[in-house]
Amino acid sequence: MQEVISYIQKAVLEISNALKFPDTSYSQNQNFTGDTQLKFDVLSDEIITKTLSQCSSIKAIISEEKDEILTLNERANFIVAYDPLDGSSLMDVNFAIGSIFAIYEEKASAKNLRAALYSMYGARLELVICKDQPKLYRLNANNEFIFIKDLRMNEKGKINATGGTQKFWEEKHAKFIKSLFDEGYRLRYSGAMVSDINQILLKGGGIFSYPATQDAPNGKLRAFFEVFPLAFIIEKAGGKTTNGKNRSLLELEFDKIHATTPCFFGSEYEISKLLKAYNE
């Protein structure tokens, strides 16, 4: 698996370099779920596809920007699912964005998830790699990723990052969010899932939520590219995840590679509070 991770590092570095002088305009194309693709979405996907295709350990790749699974080497063991540029709609305002990767063994399913990574393209290039414990790495002046620290969630946080259009929220979700603000939680929502999860993880706690809504009853975030890898990282850091009903997002199973789900990521306290609010 280390070979796979090393190729992901190469792809992340190339995307980071390309972001210094990006084309932030939209293409004429839409991805599988109907999002109009930015030209840099397409470029990022091409960079990752090109780089990972050189790795003999990768059986197939699954991209948020591709309709189907792309088989590379049927004799290999690992399947890499990825969101090439999470938060790309924020490029025009120069917010931090990132790439998300899940490494599955043999078959793409949460129970076969062996490692997860995400990159942050911000004031500096950082990479979180998680096999048994999330570890933060930072690019140094020699273009090397150096280890910074292990990441661990506190039992309770102060950050409340909540997505979805408020007028379409269910009443129970609106009440839950209000109860957090009544406790003194701070709103920290950028519109880039990877950035918001990163802040919660590095600050040690809080909650990120993207609930079922009237206009998106199955949520909007994609299980294989976004939800599963970030749930894996949060849980390995000592946090909790749920879809509002179960005890872990990693219990979920889907047949379609572009399946979506409501999702909540956070510290023990916030997720327990949410489950109580959702299931009273």
UniProtKB/Swiss-Prot annotation:
A Gene Ontology cellular-component term: cytosol
Main location: cytoplasm
UniProt family annotation: Belongs to the FBPase class 1 family.
UniProt keyword annotation of Aminoacyl-tRNA synthetase present: no
Cofactor: Mg(2+)
Binding locations of Mg(2+) 2: 83, 86, 226
EC number: 3.1.3.11
Binding sites annotated in the UniProt record for substrate: 86-89, 189, 220
Pathway involvement of the protein, from the record: Carbohydrate biosynthesis; gluconeogenesis
Subunit and interaction comment: Homotetramer.
Protein's name in the database: Fructose-1,6-bisphosphatase class 1
Organism: Campylobacter jejuni subsp. jejuni serotype O:2 (strain ATCC 700819 / NCTC 11168)
Subcellular location: Cytoplasm
Name of the coding gene: fbp
PANTHER family the UniProt entry points to: FRUCTOSE-1,6-BISPHOSPHATASE-RELATED (PTHR11556), SEDOHEPTULOSE-1,7-BISPHOSPHATASE, CHLOROPLASTIC (PTHR11556:SF35)
Molecular function GO terms recorded: fructose 1,6-bisphosphate 1-phosphatase activity; magnesium ion binding
Catalytic activity entry: beta-D-fructose 1,6-bisphosphate + H2O = beta-D-fructose 6-phosphate + phosphate
Note on cofactor: Binds 2 magnesium ions per subunit.
